[in-house]
């Protein structure tokens, strides 16, 4: 016998005589239908227990990942691993303490794998929305695959990846994190500056190969050699040795003067202007970030001050219990009928957010179109010809209304004062409506 049938048998055996006064109250309120008894298991969702457990686990996992002790432990292990990698560069220490260094590497890799798995438990799709998580997963995946693929288990691959993981640790320190964020935010502008410098290098390399390729083949034999020579000139280290090769045994002043002008122009554009642009881009972004941080700090201070003032001034008034009872309804409540709504999933929440965003974008576009239409109407109405027509029509309607009001009909003397005023008001309203319609039509 199912649990549902057992429940109904228990309900039938219960004495419900004590419900008589309640039924009479229902009848007095005009509710002649009988009270419906519902099994609570039909109302409750079976997935709720699992959802509660999943929510609790995610909450504890999130607290663990964000806990300062866990972050400090991870930073300590990564720093120790970086130190062991630096010590392994010495062949004597690497052979003597090989087992210790390999054990530290395995422990650090295990902790990194556990961190990735905990991030997946916290939210699989949320994990991939952070760029640092993607970088950590790529590093851990390559290091883990090194146990199975020998080509990946190389010192040239594993050591740089382990040291690269320290970048995420630097994000925990606020000054270092600020500098890293500034560099990452400056990457598009820095890419534009690099493209500009590369363009100048290509142009000057073509000039150098064309003008000096036959005389100084050591530095301007082809495009590759010329680009390398110009890169040395940008660094401002070694360009003087390149220029000394222009001074041949047989003095040719044209070559020396041409080379001097060539290097002077390129070093001025590439080294002084180009490299200083890098510094300008980074410093401007750093200043903007500092200003935004100061503004946010001032806003937080203002919010805290206002909250403190509200706590001191705005106190809830005291209410007597009798007044509170008057507001609460004493009508007997019906039990919940029907099943609950389906649990909200992440997919439906994302779809709902997308719909809200689309509605907001449509409203913004509607406002822009409405503003453009209003501007067009204003421009059309500001034309002199349209203004003259509008004035003529207004004068025509105002003159008609004035003549109508000044010359009342013969039967008006026989009417009451109220009827005459109502008729005149209707005439004036009709004239105003006609004028407004004419304005909107133009």
UniProtKB/Swiss-Prot annotation:
Topology term for the membrane: Multi-pass membrane protein
Tissue and organ distribution: Testis-specific.
Consequence of gene loss (knockout): Mice are normal but males are sterile. Male sterility is due to defects in sperm motility unability to fertilize intact eggs.
Transmembrane stretches, start-end: 67-88, 99-125, 130-153, 157-175, 189-212, 256-283
Regulation (activators, inhibitors): In contrast to the human ortholog, not activated by progesterone. Activated by intracellular alkalinization.
GO CC field: acrosomal vesicle; CatSper complex; sperm principal piece
GO biological process: establishment of localization in cell; flagellated sperm motility; sodium ion transport; sperm capacitation
Extracellular side of membrane: 89-98, 154-156, 213-222, 235-255
Protein keywords: Calcium, Calcium channel, Calcium transport, Cell membrane, Cell projection, Cilium, Developmental protein, Differentiation, Flagellum, Ion channel, Ion transport, Membrane, Spermatogenesis, Transmembrane, Transmembrane helix, Transport, Voltage-gated channel
Cytoplasmic compartment segments: 1-66, 126-129, 176-188, 284-442
Gene3D superfamilies, per the entry: 1.10.287.70, Voltage-gated potassium channels. Chain C
Pfam families recorded: Ion_trans (PF00520)
Reaction catalyzed: Ca(2+)(in) = Ca(2+)(out)
Keyword Endoplasmic reticulum in record: no
Subcellular localization: Cell projection, Cilium, Flagellum membrane
InterPro entries: CatSper4, Ion_trans_dom, Volt_channel_dom_sf
UniProt-recorded Gene Ontology molecular function terms: calcium-activated cation channel activity; voltage-gated calcium channel activity
Intramembrane region residues: 223-234
Subunit: Component of the CatSper complex or CatSpermasome composed of the core pore-forming members CATSPER1, CATSPER2, CATSPER3 and CATSPER4 as well as auxiliary members CATSPERB, CATSPERG2, CATSPERD, CATSPERE, CATSPERZ, C2CD6/CATSPERT, SLCO6C1, TMEM249, TMEM262 and EFCAB9. HSPA1 may be an additional auxiliary complex member. The core complex members CATSPER1, CATSPER2, CATSPER3 and CATSPER4 form a heterotetrameric channel.
Role of this protein: Pore-forming subunit of the CatSper complex, a sperm-specific voltage-gated calcium channel that plays a central role in sperm cell hyperactivation. Controls calcium entry to mediate the hyperactivated motility, a step needed for sperm motility which is essential late in the preparation of sperm for fertilization.
Similarity annotation: Belongs to the cation channel sperm-associated (TC 1.A.1.19) family.
Protein name: Cation channel sperm-associated protein 4
Organism: Mus musculus
Gene: Catsper4
């Amino acid at each position: 016998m199912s649990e549902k049938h057992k429940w109904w048998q228990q309900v039938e055996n219960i004495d419900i005589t004590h419900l008589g006064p309640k039924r009479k109250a229902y009848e007095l309120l005009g509710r002649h239908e009988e009270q419906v008894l519902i099994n609570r298991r039909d109302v409750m969702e079976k997935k709720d227990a699992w959802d509660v457990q999943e929510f609790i686990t995610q909450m504890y996992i999130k607290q663990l990942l964000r806990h300062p002790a866990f972050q400090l432990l991870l930073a300590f292990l990564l720093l120790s691993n970086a130190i062991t990698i630096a010590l392994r560069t010495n062949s004597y220490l690497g052979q003597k303490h090989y087992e210790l260094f390999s054990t530290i590497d395995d422990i650090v890799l295990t902790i990194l794998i556990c961190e990735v798995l905990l991030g997946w438990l916290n939210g699989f799709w949320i994990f991939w929305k952070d760029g640092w998580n993607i970088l950590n997963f790529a590093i851990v995946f390559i290091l883990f695959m090194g146990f199975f693929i020998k080509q990946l288990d190389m010192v040239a691959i594993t050591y740089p990846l382990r040291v690269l993981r320290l970048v995420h640790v630097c994000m925990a320190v606020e000054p270092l994190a600020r500098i890293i964020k500034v560099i990452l935010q400056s990457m598009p502008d820095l890419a534009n500056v690099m493209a500009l410098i590369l363009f100048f290098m290509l142009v000057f390399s073509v000039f150098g190969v064309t003008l000096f390729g036959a005389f100084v083949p050591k530095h301007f034999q082809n495009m590759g050699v010329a680009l390398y020579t110009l890169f040395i000139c940008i660094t401002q280290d070694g360009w003087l040795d390149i220029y000394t090769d222009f001074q041949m045994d047989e003095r040719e002043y044209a070559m020396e003067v041409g080379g001097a002008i060539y290097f002077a122009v390129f070093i001025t554009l590439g080294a002084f202007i180009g490299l200083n642009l890098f510094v300008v881009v980074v410093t401007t972004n750093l200043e903007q970030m500092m200003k935004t941080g100061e503004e946010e700090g001032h806003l937080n201070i203002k919010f805290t001050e206002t909250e403190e003032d509200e706590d001191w001034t705005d106190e809830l008034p005291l209410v007597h219990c009798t007044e509170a009872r008057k507001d609460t309804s004493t009508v007997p409540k019906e039990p919940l009928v029907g099943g609950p709504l389906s649990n909200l999933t992440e997919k439906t929440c994302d779809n709902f957010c997308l719909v809200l965003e689309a509605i907001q974008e449509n409203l913004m576009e509607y406002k822009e179109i409405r503003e453009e239409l209003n501007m067009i109407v204003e421009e059309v109405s500001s034309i002199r010809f349209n203004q003259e027509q509008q004035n003529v029509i207004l004068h025509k309607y105002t003159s008609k209304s004035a003549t109508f009001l000044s010359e009342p009909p013969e039967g008006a003397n026989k009417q009451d004062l109220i009827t005459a005023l109502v008729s005149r008001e209707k005439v004036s309203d009709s004239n105003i409506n006609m004028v407004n319609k004419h304005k909107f039509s133009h």
